[in-house]
Amino acid sequence: MKLLHLDSSILGDYSASRQLTASIVAKLQAADPALQYTYRDLAANPIGHLSGAHLAAAQNPPATRTPELANDLALGVQVLQEFLDADTVVIGVALYNFTISTQLKAWIDRVLVAGKTFRYTAEGALEGLAGNKRVILAVARGGRYGEGSPTAALEHAETYMRAALGFVGLHQPEVVVAEGLALGPEARAAGMAAAQAQIDALPV
């Protein structure tokens, strides 16, 4: 079994989502020490954003590509293969200005690939090709954006990830949420404790 672990927070050791993904991964590894583990820190080692050069590369001979573009395209192939090969994917999702980090968006753009993770049928219907992976999202939010809160409509991180994963056929991600983390020390401690309880309840 292969485990892919992704962190995307820019906050380093202060990051709540990193603490949560580490706890989730530790639980999974304790249950199966033979797990093949791949880690990618999308903030420390960001993936380049797509550009017109990437689109043009598909239409032109490889010999016309600059070394920088060739290396970037090779990284994209590697990132996609890591996702395709994984049986379980654990993703740290920090909420920035109502949505995911730009670093995580760059990763999403490399794994939502027509013909690889989704396709359209002859009738025009969407078909996800990502298989039956287990996906666990560790969502960290400074405020309170949960269902029923006044700001719930502004939450576009968890909702975006659910949409992107559903697009490739992964419709049932497991979601751990820590929120209220920027509302003071007590609120942060309570939010992290609630998230850890969710992790403790995850099946292995």
Swiss-Prot record:
Highest taxon of the lineage: Bacteria
Obligatory cofactor(s): FMN
Enzyme Commission identifier(s): 1.6.5.-, 1.7.1.17
InterPro entries: Flavodoxin_fold, Flavoprotein-like_sf, FMN-dep_NADH:Q_OxRdtase_AzoR1, NADH:quinone_OxRdtase_FMN_depd
Alphabetical list of Gene3D superfamilies matching this protein: 3.40.50.360
An annotated Gene Ontology molecular function: oxidoreductase activity, acting on NAD(P)H as acceptor
Alphabetized UniProt keyword annotations: Flavoprotein, FMN, NAD, Oxidoreductase
Annotated binding of FMN, by residue: S9, S15, A16, S17
Function: Quinone reductase that provides resistance to thiol-specific stress caused by electrophilic quinones.
Family under the similarity heading: Belongs to the azoreductase type 1 family.
HAMAP family documented for this protein: Azoreductase_type1 (MF_01216)
Record-linked PANTHER family: FMN-DEPENDENT NADH-AZOREDUCTASE 1, FMN-DEPENDENT NADH:QUINONE OXIDOREDUCTASE
Quaternary structure (record): Homodimer.
Name of protein: FMN-dependent NADH:quinone oxidoreductase
